[in-house]
């Protein structure tokens, strides 16, 4: 009797194993035989079922008007794009981009990274700001006139400031002050003028006699003159 029970158990285990093998083969056969059209059809059916389930789960209000059906999921659009041969990554780009031909609004600033014909000089690996046509000039580094090349040329022009140019612009003190501030020579010019004023006062002041002034000694008074007298 124990031998028969063991044989029956072994036979039952073998039968279960054969059933498992058959089901595995059937499952594998059903998956491998299906083509791309079957897979697309199955995905469409699953999407429709999910939409129907969500529509049934929502409580329908009696006052609400029937609205348009919900939009299909983006997975189906991606699958259809793959089926037609177009790259699916185009779906990730926002609508109304530069590729569709829509012009940018006036004043829009965009960054150009490595585009040929637009990046010049040493700013090739960096972001160069460009203003859309029809926009006014923006202040600050976003303006085209403040690119590295123009800044360098502007500094070179400031260094070429000479005494002759200062004499010519002496009639306008605001312009002279602006030139000194831009060139960075404001402090140097102030020290130079103070030294000239002290030397001029020392040369024009009469020598004080010894004992005069009641024994009072102190620094000479310095009178500052207009800038035109020294230049």
From Swiss-Prot:
Acidic residues bias (residue ranges): 7-23
Keyword Membrane appears in the UniProt entry: no
Assembly: Binds GSK-3 and prevents GSK-3-dependent phosphorylation.
Record region (Involved in GSK-3 binding): 172-194
InterPro entries: GSK3-bd (IPR008014)
One GO process term, biological-process aspect: regulation of protein export from nucleus
Described purpose of this protein according to its UniProt entry: Positively regulates the Wnt signaling pathway by stabilizing beta-catenin through the association with GSK-3.
GO cellular component: cytoplasm; nucleus
Annotated Pfam families: GSK-3_bind
Key word Transport present: no
UniProtKB keywords: Wnt signaling pathway
Protein name as it appears in the record: GSK-3-binding protein FRAT2
Family: Belongs to the GSK-3-binding protein family.
Gene name tied to this protein: Frat2
Region of interest (Disordered), residue spans: 1-24, 53-109, 203-231
């Amino acid at each position: 009797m124990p031998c028969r029970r063991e044989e029956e158990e072994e036979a039952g285990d073998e039968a279960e194993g054969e059933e498992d093998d058959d089901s595995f083969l059937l499952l594998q056969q059903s998956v491998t035989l299906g083509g791309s059209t079957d897979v697309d059809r199955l995905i469409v059916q699953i999407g429709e079922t999910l939409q129907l389930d969500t529509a049934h789960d929502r409580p329908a209000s009696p006052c609400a008007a029937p609205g348009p059906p919900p939009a299909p999921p983006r997975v189906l659009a991606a699958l259809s794009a793959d089926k037609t041969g177009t790259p699916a990554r185009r779906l990730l780009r926002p609508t109304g981009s530069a590729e569709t031909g829509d012009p940018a609004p006036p004043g829009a600033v965009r960054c150009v990274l490595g585009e040929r014909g637009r990046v010049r000089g040493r700013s090739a690996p960096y972001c160069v700001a460009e203003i859309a046509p029809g926009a006014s000039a923006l202040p600050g580094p976003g303006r085209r006139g403040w690119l590295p090349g123009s800044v360098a040329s502007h500094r070179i022009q400031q260094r070429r400031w000479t005494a002759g140019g200062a004499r010519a612009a002496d009639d306008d003190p605001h312009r002279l002050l602006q030139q000194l501030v831009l060139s960075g020579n404001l402090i140097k010019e102030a020290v130079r003028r103070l030294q000239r004023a002290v030397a001029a006062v020392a040369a024009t002041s009469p020598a004080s006699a010894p004992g005069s002034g009641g024994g009072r000694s102190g620094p000479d008074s310095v009178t500052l003159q207009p800038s035109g007298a020294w230049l």
